[in-house]
Amino acid sequence: MTEVQQTEKVTPRLKTKYREEIRGALQEQFQYGNVMQVPGLVKVVVNMGVGEAAKDSKIIDGAVTDLTAITGQKPMITKARKSIAQFKLREGMPIGTHATLRGDRMWEFLDRLVTLALPRIRDFRGLSDRQFDGNGNYTFGLSEQTVFHEIDQDKIDRVRGMDITVVTTAKNDDEGRALLKALGFPFKTDQ
């Protein structure tokens, strides 16, 4: 008889840390009566704008390949909603890609981002803590995709930046900042 091998589902390291340590600490810090009031993560959106794709549609393929390697899932191609003559842009032309990460993929991506990718940025002094949107969500940009280990530096066709948005259930920026700081986001200290 053939044996069906049961593979154990491994919980991401950062998710375990959040459940066991961070959630309790935040509940004490903000004096919540209910554990469900503690801010958590909803999703992470990684967006790569590729404006040059309007002139050459092959450029978008490189961005899709890079984003697939970084996030571990196939990204959506963003198309232009309106035609803009000054940019030589027609409605429906591909102008970027984005991937929305939820669940375990989100936790794994954030773990890799905080522990491996951000420390590889040259002259990195920390993330600005002024980029919250007022509702506890945080957006920041990376100027090149080579900070991720998944990208082979010899095989990149061009340097592409990306925007990363971390959506949380926090009610305000202070809660969001406390959550991300506890998760290991390196914010600038001297302001």
UniProtKB/Swiss-Prot annotation:
Keywords: Ribonucleoprotein, Ribosomal protein, RNA-binding, rRNA-binding, tRNA-binding. InterPro entries: Ribosomal_uL5, Ribosomal_uL5_bac-type, Ribosomal_uL5_C, Ribosomal_uL5_CS, Ribosomal_uL5_dom_sf, Ribosomal_uL5_N. Coiled coil: none annotated. The keyword RNA-binding applies. GO terms for biological process: translation. One of its GO terms (molecular function) is tRNA binding. Gene3D superfamilies: 3.30.1440.10. GO terms for cellular component: ribonucleoprotein complex; ribosome. NCBIfam families: PRK00010.1. Part of the 50S ribosomal subunit; part of the 5S rRNA/L5/L18/L25 subcomplex. Contacts the 5S rRNA and the P site tRNA. Forms a bridge to the 30S subunit in the 70S ribosome. This is one of the proteins that bind and probably mediate the attachment of the 5S RNA into the large ribosomal subunit, where it forms part of the central protuberance. In the 70S ribosome it contacts protein S13 of the 30S subunit (bridge B1b), connecting the 2 subunits; this bridge is implicated in subunit movement. Contacts the P site tRNA; the 5S rRNA and some of its associated proteins might help stabilize positioning of ribosome-bound tRNAs. Belongs to the universal ribosomal protein uL5 family. HAMAP family: Ribosomal_uL5_B. This is Large ribosomal subunit protein uL5. It comes from Micrococcus luteus (strain ATCC 4698 / DSM 20030 / JCM 1464 / CCM 169 / CCUG 5858 / IAM 1056 / NBRC 3333 / NCIMB 9278 / NCTC 2665 / VKM Ac-2230) (Micrococcus lysodeikticus).
